[in-house]
Amino acid sequence: MSKYYLGVDIGSISTKAVIIDDDLKIIAKEYLETNGAPIDATKKVIESLKKQIEKSKEKIELYGIGTTGSARNLIGSILGATIVKNEITAHAIGTLSRFPDARTILEIGGQDSKVIIIRNGVVVDYAMNTLCAAGTGAFLSAQAKRLGVKIEDLGKVALTSKSPAKIAARCTVFAESDLVHKAQMGISKEDIIAGICEAVAKNFLNNLCKNKKIEDKVIFQGGVSKNIGVKKAFEKLLDKKVYVDEDSHLFGALGVAILSKKNSTGYIPFDFNIKDINYKVRSNECNGCSNNCELISVYDDKGIIDILGSRCGKYTKTVSWKLT
């Protein structure tokens, strides 16, 4: 009987999950919005995986469960994960499984972005931007709504532009103000959208890729990788081909599923029914820096399970996760 492995990537904007077999083939997958409720989102993606498995009439026995993403400790505790890993490692492993010769990973998610430099199959450098929303999936969604365009159509509309507008995307406030100004000037919606896509790519490269050598093969991943306009903008600015896989938005979940396979110690009795757990939530504002993040502490009678909402990663480093 084949062995299978579950990977879950719980982000602030979206939650992704995959089940892979011993050959690293994805046999079930799901991508849903987190909507500020990581536990509920996880229940939904696991339920979806369960239905896909039942439909295929395949008997699934798990030999590994992995979690990654901003709520990885919390969800790892709930699922009884055998491995919990940071996003950099998970995304790199997921990418290398599809692109063994990858040397640069550009990743833009819902509220953060990152560049990962790989040499000889090993991560040698990386940079993350979790402090500014400009250029993230949430930013693009907000601008699409403002312009009356479906987010899934944003990239296609951008490709119809003949003269992309110059949009200042260094800050969401400036970008939105500039967008309104350009519209008032009579610049077409297509040119504004193309300008937004180019601004996102330019902002990413200027902020995250300073002093970093971007070498082929360049892989674009994360939810925003599905925006063909941003992909084309990266290719234009880098003068390189940028690759996007059909599962590029799932690479974090794929990567941690692969890691759970590598660290498997045997069969895991998991019935895909997440039981309700007793936990408490306490919110408070962190005054450690000018971000003033709204933190959400999740804990049970044994202590803190996870702290969510830290944009600088301060509390990700201090929360210890233990398999119970």
List the predicted regions and their residue ranges.
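Conserved phosphate-binding/catalytic loops in two-lobed NTP-binding clefts
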Residues: 82-88, 235-254
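Short beta-strand-loop/turn "lid" adjacent to the catalytic site in phosphate-handling enzymes
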Residues: 21, 28-34, 53-88, 124-125
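Glycine-rich phosphate-binding loop plus the immediately following alpha-helix
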Residues: 35-39, 120-163, 171, 262, ...
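Gly/Thr-rich phosphate-binding beta-strand-loop-beta motif of the actin/hexokinase/Hsp70
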Residues: 1-23, 102-119, 288-300
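Glycine-rich phosphate-binding loops at beta-strand->alpha-helix junctions
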Residues: 70-71, 199, 210-237, 248-251
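Short glycine-rich, Thr/Ser-proximal phosphate-binding strand/loop in the N-terminal lobe
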Residues: 4-44, 125-126, 130-131, 311-312
